[in-house]
Design a protein with these regions (language model features):
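Conserved histidines in hydrophobic membrane contexts and catalytic metal-binding motifs
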Residues: 1-438
Length: 438
C-alpha cells in the first residue's frame, strides 16, 4: 500500500531540494558573515599600532576643541565628524574634508559601507563618525577621509585604510553580492536568503520528534556513534540551537536585498526602516550667526552628558551648511549592554538644544525599526550578542556541508538497496530457469 504524502514528507522534500539549489551561495554568505561579525575588533587588533594608544600616568586628553583646531591645521582641511570611544586607550576618529582641486566621496569605513547598502543587501558595516548616522560627504574642497588621532598628543596615527581593512572589504563584497555588484549578485544573495528562511522553518519541522520519547535525541550530539550519526546530529542539533538567531539574521538581511521587502517591513512596523539614511538634521537659523559666539564642542558634549548620564561612545556630526546643526549620537559600551544610540541636536550658532531622542522613550515599533541593522549584525547587546551571532553563523556555515553529506549518504543507501533488489530478481530468475530445465 502506498504511503500517504504527509506534511513531514513535504517538508523533507522542500528542505532537500531548496538546500541543494542554494547550498553553495548560503555557504559563502554564512562563512563571510561569520568572519565579518568581529570585523572591528580584528582590524583594531591587526593594526593595533594605529588604533591603540598608551597614555602616560596622569596624562589627560587634549580638549576636543583644541584637538579639532590642531587636526584642521595639520591636514589643511575641515573636520566634519568625530568618533570618541569610551575606551581611554583608543584613538579618536576624525573625518576631514581636505582641501583639493576636486570633490569626491568620503573614505569608506565599515559603517559607511553598511549605509551605502541601505537600500540593497546583507551588508556588515564601522569607521568614521558616519557609521551609524549619515556619513560626512565630500564637497567642492575634496572628499571626506577618516584619520586616527591620538587624543593625548594630537598626533595622527594613520587612516582606516589598510590591508586588513581591504580584506574585510572583499569579505563584504562576497557577503553582500558575491563580488557581482553590478551583475545580479544582490538578487542571487536575496533569493538564497528567502530560501534560507524556508530551510530553517522546514528544518524545524523535521527536527520535531514524532514520538515524545525521542525528544532528548534532538538536543544532543551522539559522539559515540559512527561518523554518519555524528554528521546527522551536527546538522540536526546545531540547526535547532541556532534557528532563532538565523531567522533574525535572514529576515533583517532581506531589508537590504529587496526594496519591496523593506517597504513591507516598514508598513508592518509602522515606522520606516533605515529612515536615518534620509533623515535630515534639525535646521539652524542663519540669522543667529552674528548674534552669538559659536558654541564650544566641549560644552555640547557636556550638555549631551546631562541628557544621557552614562559612560559611552560619542559620534559627532558637524553642520553641513549654514542651516545645519550639530548632531551627537551617544551609545553605551560594554560586554552586555544595549548599544542603541541616543541622539541630541544643537543649534550651530547658539548651542541651544533643538531635539533630544532617547532610545528607551521610543515606542517599541520604532525601536525595532531603528535596530534592524544591529539585529542583523549582532551588536544589539554588545560583545555578548556578537558571540552568540558568531556561533550561530558558524553553525549555519556548517549546515550546507553536513546536509550535503546526509544527502549523499542517503543516495548511496538507496543505490545499494536498488542494486540488492536487482540481484535478488536475477537470482530468482536464474532459479526459475533452472527449475524449468530440470
Amino acid at each position: 500500500m502506498k504511503k500517504k504524502y504527509s506534511f513531514r514528507k513535504f517538508s523533507n522534500d522542500i528542505h532537500l531540494w531548496l538546500g541543494i539549489a542554494s547550498g553553495l551561495v548560503l555557504f559563502v554568505v554564512c562563512l563571510t558573515g561569520t568572519i565579518l561579525t568581529f570585523e572591528k575588533e580584528i582590524v583594531e587588533w591587526a593594526d593595533s599600532e594605529r588604533y591603540h594608544v598608551e597614555a602616560a600616568a596622569g596624562a589627560t586628553v587634549i580638549p576636543i576643541d583644541e584637538l579639532v583646531a590642531k587636526t584642521e591645521a595639520g591636514l589643511k582641511g575641515k573636520v566634519t565628524g568625530i568618533e570618541i570611544p569610551a575606551n581611554p586607550n583608543a584613538v579618536y576618529r576624525f573625518t576631514v574634508q581636505e582641501k583639493g582641486p576636486k570633490g569626491g566621496k568620503p573614505e569608506e569605513g565599515k559603517g559607511d559601507r553598511m549605509k551605502n547598502a541601505e537600500g540593497g543587501g546583507m551588508k556588515k558595516a564601522e569607521a568614521g563618525p558616519g557609521a551609524k548616522a549619515e556619513g560626512p560627504k565630500g564637497g567642492k574642497g575634496g572628499g571626506g577621509k577618516t584619520y586616527l588621532v591620538n587624543p593625548y598628543n594630537g598626533d595622527i596615527t594613520g587612516t582606516t585604510k589598510s590591508a586588513t581593512a581591504e580584506f574585510f572589504s572583499t569579505m563584504m563584497g562576497l557577503h553582500r553580492w558575491l563580488l557581482l555588484q553590478d551583475s545580479g549578485g544582490k538578487i542571487i544573495v536575496g533569493a538564497a536568503t528567502i530560501i534560507f528562511v524556508f530551510l530553517v522553518l522546514s528544518g524545524l519541522v523535521l527536527w520535531w520528534p514524532i514520538k515524545l520519547r525521542n525528544w532528548k535525541q534532538g538536543f544532543q550530539i551522539k559522539f559515540s556513534g559512527n561518523w554518519k550519526r555524528i554528521n546527522h546530529d551536527l546538522h540536526n542539533t546545531l540547526g535547532f540551537y541556532s534557528f532563532v538567531v538565523l531567522l533574525i539574521m535572514a529576515l533583517t538581511g532581506l531589508c537590504w536585498s529587496f526594496e519591496w521587502y523593506k517597504t513591507g517591513v516598514s508598513d508592518v512596523l509602522g515606522d520606516e526602516v533605515f529612515k536615518q539614511r534620509r533623515e535630515k538634521p534639525m535646521p539652524s537659523d542663519p540669522m543667529n550667526a552674528g548674534n552669538a559666539a559659536k558654541p564650544m564642542l566641549a560644552s555640547l558634549i557636556s550638555s549631551a552628558d546631562q541628557s544621557f548620564p552614562y559612560e559611552g561612545n560619542y559620534r559627532l556630526r558637524f553642520p553641513a551648511d549654514s542651516a545645519g546643526s550639530y548632531v551627537i549620537n551617544k551609545s553605551r559600551s560594554g560586554f552586555f549592554v544595549l548599544t542603541a544610540a541616543d541622539k541630541i541636536q544643537f543649534e550651530q550658532y547658539t548651542g541651544a538644544v533643538l531635539k533630544t531622542e532617547k532610545f528607551s522613550d521610543k515606542p517599541f515599533n520604532e525601536q525595532v525599526a531603528s535596530s534592524v541593522r544591529s539585529l542583523h549584525l549582532g551588536d544589539i547587546y554588545g560583545t555578548f550578542s556578537k558571540i552568540i551571532y558568531f556561533l550561530a553563523c558558524l553553525f549555519a556555515t556548517s549546515l550546507p556541508v553536513t546536509g550535503t553529506i546526509i544527502w549523499i549518504n542517503k543516495l548511496r543507501k538507496k543505490n545499494k538497496k536498488q542494486a540488492a533488489g536487482k540481484r535478488r530478481v536475477q537470482r530468482l530468475q536464474q532459479h526459475q530457469a533452472t527449475t524449468v530445465v530440470v
